[in-house]
Amino acid sequence: MSLREKVTEAMLTNSPIPNSKVDAKRKFYYASYEDNLFCPLGEQALKAYDNGSGAETRPTEKMVKGQKVISPAKMASIASSSAMTFNLLGNEPATILTDDILPRGTYDVQYEKQMYTVKKGSNPANLDAFLSNENDKTAIFCEMKMLEWLGNPSCLKEAYLNKNYYFAADYANIGCPIDAYQTF
């Protein structure tokens, strides 16, 4: 059993899925992703997750060795990073009360925001959450991990290590794609 599975087992031991809500076919899954959320997805959040590329709210089908396999919505997993992200941020704007690390203020929350990666010409990636405060011109980019870090991490591709792809503070006013925001 992998470390990730051991941690997930421990989570279930301390907070089991109620029998009426468990997915009888899949260990570590609710029968419905809605049961894994603290509150229902609002219209904007549901639309964002439905338009995302990760099948967070819908089952997927694929053929494996000639057999049709249906996988549940990813948010139905007790180890779902997207469910964790939504449970932390919810439907309403997020408020940061202190300015110890991030500027205090109220931030609009967008889930599955598409943003281009450092490799030119690639398809945009879906960011788990994007928080923006137009008044202070501040953006917070959130890529959340629940238990993924317990698996076998792969090395970063060379493109991610090339500093030429990254924004530098002194370029902020010369046409950077995010020049409307303060980055940190």
Language-model regions, residue ranges each:
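A Trp-anchored, charged/polar loop motif used as the substrate-binding/catalytic surface
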Residues: 120-129, 182-184
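Hydrophobic transmembrane signal anchors and adjacent membrane-proximal interface regions, especially
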Residues: 88, 139, 165-167
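Acidic, metal/cofactor-coordinating or nucleic-acid-engaging core segments within structured domains
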Residues: 151-184
